[in-house]
């Protein structure tokens, strides 16, 4: 194969010796198994599993029990090979590098049968000097070692003491010792995902040749001068200089929209050199800042930086630069022990509302630009402003962060360490240091990233005794923890990026953890930092179940995906809640029973004699249960923003677990694999609305709060309505006098004893009626219509099966569903099967005879296709 040379950034007339070339090695490769019995083509970027699937040697890895049947793939040692010709004499170049942006994971790299380097970290860039090895005709081999075997070998060599955990719980069908390999930790199995320890070249690979120097990293960070009230821009460019002579030239920075044109003289000496440029923006120039979604615009400015160096060598970089500040505020709170824990963006306190992001697929080459756009657009469509990139996955691809910049999604960025203790031997630490240095350089220019976090739950795992470690080794583990996350990761982060905070773990007690030597005896202290909270036994409709914490960065409940999603990876014999498939797909111990337990607290379990009908009804009820549970919990956190009760409160963040799915299985997600919205995601669109009325009971008293995430005070009125389950006619209604909710506050709007409320509504009891309420001004709805159940729905009286029909019409690219119902219907679920798209609302309480809902397709469809696929379910249909 003849590869063309891409001449980079060289002006016309420049001598060939000054040019830089980049030769892409993406595309067609060959792979073979350890014994050579399997030989096949493969695509780079990619992995072995994808290559086998594309050649139909294996079926869909997600189908039924294939995660077990295909375990042999990860246990084998695979080799990638590429033969290519170069039409240029590489000997004319001073330096030639073979660069891998990502290798998964443990491999020996050979060029023309000469070993040129080893890899052991999925998360770092590798650059190998091949100046004296490259020829006109070349063969690259990447000989991978099984990650499963490697992890076991590294664990066996660590004989001084145990580094737990050894293996995941048996229910996860996973592999052991993932903490000994710098690889996507969930690829060895997790409680929501399969074990697929991949091998492959998962990112870009190329050859770079140059004579003078090469630009390796280009970074920039806006800095606000509080004293001068001006913006500055720091631009850092990392060069590899191979010339023995001093290289001189100019760096020209241009930001036309800010009237910036600045020229700097620069000099580069031999070796790894970083050029720092400082751009001071005139105080008279108005700079529009970047704001999170819902709080303002995501204004960015086009910037170009041109390096014109000796001999006509020219490098040009273009980027969008955003201006914003971020501050993590930990300060005393009146009438409360402890400290606050919240983020200020551009000086404004922001309540983080969102979810947690996990890898969108076990096979990263299947995560397309379209899929990222769909998932992240669904984030802002649900009124979220933040995601936590969880530490057991991957540092996401560049496009992920670019989309978050564009959409205004704040990112809490974990480093990739999760639910484990880790070794601190020299080889491991050397690899981690390279990883962290690379990722900070790669990511720090993104305004969307507002904080770094050292790990997921590892402080809690150590200090709360998750792994039954021997007491005599506690100090050893503490020393290792501080060595890894504080002395190394934290040090590297703070040296490379002074523009955003770093916390050592999540959950953590923040400043208190630091004061206690980086590990707190109780990392879940509600008076400090962030917490993670899960409780599948207590009644999730009871708000007293939940912690009145400063910031809740994980919480949630499981549900099953829709039947249309499961159908693609299952067969008819699997369509039962007690089937082998249903048990196999559930990776949380007792998870399926815990869902039934929560359902039984407030709903009737399906009892149809038709097995498929009962299965579908159960799937539906798990989504109803999950949505209602997370709604109750999130609303509790939102109304806790402005209050302190018994020293607890001032909650400033709610990130539920989890946003997306890695495969088709029961999980905590609100988006199914492929992006279909669960009922929870529709609920999130309401409970994360900028203005929300929240209702709850305490000692027979109904309270309604108003929670505002607006930037300005708002005058409005509250309307409270009562319906019976047996009639579509409104029983009674009352409205308050106009009042003002202050910007960014949560305040009590309404209190009334429930017996008094019902007394004024003829024929109403707790079991026969339901309360709804909303905020409005001058007849205009300002909030979602919220509701409060006065009893468990399994005890509801007068609830009938509703005959709900839909008339579908098309308006441009949108479809209109005009609904009619014969009865009050809770949890009305509209479904169009596998047709990709989302509704404007779903899972709603229908108390009116008619309602109009819109469907936004993600791919072209038709009215007839929607009519054929349409199905509607409400709660009474499951009885």
From Swiss-Prot:
Substrate binds at residues 190-192, 456. The active site is at 457 (proton donor), 554 (nucleophile). GO terms for molecular function: beta-mannosidase activity. GO terms for cellular component: lysosome. Disulfide bonds join 167-176, 540-629, 732-761, 764-769. It holds the Pfam family Glyco_hydro_2_C. Its EC number is 3.2.1.25. The N-terminus is blocked. The keyword Disulfide bond applies. Pathway: Glycan metabolism; N-glycan degradation. It catalyses: Hydrolysis of terminal, non-reducing beta-D-mannose residues in beta-D-mannosides. InterPro entries: Beta-gal/glucu_dom_sf, Beta-mannosidase-like_N2, Beta-mannosidase_GH2, Beta-mannosidase_Ig, Galactose-bd-like_sf, Glyco_hydro_2_cat, Glycoside_hydrolase_SF, Ig-like_fold. Residues 1-17 form the signal peptide. Keywords: Disulfide bond, Glycoprotein, Glycosidase, Hydrolase, Lysosome, Signal. Glycans are attached at residues 35, 77, 297, 302, 607, 803. It is found in: Lysosome. The keyword Signal applies. It comes from the Eukaryota. It is linked to Defects in MANBA cause beta-mannosidosis, a severe disorder that affects peripheral and central nervous system myelin resulting in tremor, nystagmus, ataxia and early death. The primary storage products associated with the enzyme deficiency are the trisaccharide Man-beta-1-4-GlcNAc-beta-1-4-GlcNAc and the disaccharide Man-beta-1-4-GlcNAc. Monomer. This is Beta-mannosidase.
């Amino acid at each position: 194969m003849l590869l063309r040379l891409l001449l980079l950034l060289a002006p016309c007339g420049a001598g060939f010796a000054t040019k830089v070339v980049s030769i892409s090695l993406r595309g067609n490769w060959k792979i073979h198994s350890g014994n050579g019995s399997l030989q096949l083509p493969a695509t780079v970027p990619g992995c072995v599993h994808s290559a086998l699937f594309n050649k139909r040697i294996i079926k869909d890895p997600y189908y039924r029990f294939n995660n077990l049947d295909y375990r042999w793939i990860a246990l084998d040692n695979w080799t990638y090979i590429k033969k290519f010709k170069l039409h240029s004499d590489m000997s004319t170049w001073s330096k030639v590098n073979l660069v891998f942006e990502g290798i998964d994971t443990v491999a020996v790299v050979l060029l023309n049968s000469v070993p040129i380097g080893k890899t052991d970290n999925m998360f770092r860039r590798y650059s190998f000097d091949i100046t004296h090895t490259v020829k006109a005709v070349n063969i690259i081999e990447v000989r991978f070692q099984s990650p499963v075997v490697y992890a076991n070998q590294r664990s066996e060599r660590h004989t001084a003491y145990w580094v737990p955990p050894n293996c995941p719980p048996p229910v996860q069908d996973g592999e052991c010792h993932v903490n000994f390999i710098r690889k996507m930790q969930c690829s060895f199995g997790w409680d929501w995902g399969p074990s697929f320890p991949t091998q492959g070249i998962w990112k870009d690979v190329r050859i770079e040749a140059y004579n003078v120097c090469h630009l390796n990293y280009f970074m920039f960070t806006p800095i606000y001068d509080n004293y001068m009230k001006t913006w500055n821009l720091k631009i850092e460019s990392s060069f590899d200089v191979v010339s023995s002579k001093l290289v001189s030239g100019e760096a020209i920075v241009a930001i036309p929209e800010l009237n910036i044109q600045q020229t700097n003289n620069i000099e580069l000496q031999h070796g790894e050199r970083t050029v720092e440029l400082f751009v001071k923006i005139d105080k008279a120039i108005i700079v529009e800042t970047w704001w999170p979604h819902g709080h303002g615009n995501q204004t960015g400015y086009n910037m170009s930086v041109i390096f014109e160096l000796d001999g006509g060598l020219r490098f040009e970089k273009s980027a969008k630069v955003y201006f914003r500040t971020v501050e993590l505020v930990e300060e005393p709170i009146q009438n409360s022990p402890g400290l606050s824990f919240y983020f200020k963006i551009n000086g404004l306190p922001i309540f983080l509302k969102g979810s947690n992001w996990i890898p969108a697929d076990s096979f990263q080459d299947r995560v397309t630009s379209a899929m990222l756009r769909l998932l992240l657009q669904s984030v802002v469509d649900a009124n979220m402003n933040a995601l936590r990139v969880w530490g057991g996955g991957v540092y996401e691809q560049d496009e992920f962060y670019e989309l978050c910049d564009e959409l205004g999604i704040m990112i809490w960025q974990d480093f990739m360490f999760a639910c484990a203790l880790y070794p601190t031997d020299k080889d491991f630490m050397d690899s981690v240091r390279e990883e962290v240095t690379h990722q900070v350089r790669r990511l720090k220019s993104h305004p969307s990233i507002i904080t770094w976090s050292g790990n997921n739950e590892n402080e809690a795992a150590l200090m709360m005794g998750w792994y039954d470690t021997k007491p005599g080794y506690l100090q050893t583990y503490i020393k290792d923890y501080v060595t890894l996350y504080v002395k190394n990761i934290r040090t590297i982060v703070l040296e490379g990026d002074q523009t955003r905070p770093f916390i050592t773990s999540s959950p953590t007690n923040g400043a208190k953890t630091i004061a206690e030597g980086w590990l707190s005896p109780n990392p879940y202290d509600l008076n400090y930092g962030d917490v993670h909270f899960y409780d599948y036994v207590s009644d999730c409709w009871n708000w007293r179940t939940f912690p009145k914490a400063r910031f809740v960065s994980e919480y949630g409940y499981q549900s099953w995906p829709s039947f249309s999603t499961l159908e693609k990876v299952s067969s008819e014999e699997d369509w039962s809640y007690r089937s082998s498939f249903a048990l196999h797909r559930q990776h949380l111990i007792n998870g399926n029973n815990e869902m039934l337990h929560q359902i039984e607290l407030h709903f009737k379990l399906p009892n149809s004699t038709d097995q498929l009908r009962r299965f579908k009804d159960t799937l539906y009820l798990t989504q109803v249960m999950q949505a209602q549970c997370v709604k109750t919990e999130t609303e509790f956190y939102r109304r806790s923003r402005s209050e302190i009760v018994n020293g607890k409160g001032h909650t400033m963040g709610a990130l539920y677990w989890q946003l997306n799915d890695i495969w088709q299985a029961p999980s905590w997600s609100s988006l199914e694999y492929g992006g279909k919205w669960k009922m929870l995601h529709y609920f999130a669109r309401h409970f994360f609305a900028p203005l929300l009325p929240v209702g709850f009971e305490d000692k027979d008293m109904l309270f309604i709060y108003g929670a505002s995430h607006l930037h300005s005070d708002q005058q409005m009125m509250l309307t409270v309505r009562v319906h019976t389950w047996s009639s579509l006619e409104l029983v009674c209604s009352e409205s308050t006098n106009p009042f003002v909710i202050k910007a960014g506050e949560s305040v009590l709007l309404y209190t009334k004893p429930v017996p008094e409320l019902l007394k004024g509504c003829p024929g109403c009891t707790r079991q026969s009626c339901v309360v709804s309420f909303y905020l409005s001004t001058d007849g205009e709805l300002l909030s979602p219509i919220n509701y409060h159940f006065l009893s468990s729905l399994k005890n509801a009286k007068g609830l009938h099966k509703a005959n709900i029909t839909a008339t579908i019409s098309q308006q441009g690219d949108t479809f209109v569903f005009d609904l009619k119902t014969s009865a009050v219907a809770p949890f009305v679920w509209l479904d169009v099967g596998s047709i990709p798209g989302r509704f404007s609302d779903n899972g709603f309480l229908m108390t009116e005879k008619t309602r109009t809902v819109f469907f936004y397709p993600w791919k072209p469809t038709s009215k007839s296709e929607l009519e054929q696929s349409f199905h509607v379910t409400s709660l009474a249909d499951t009885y």
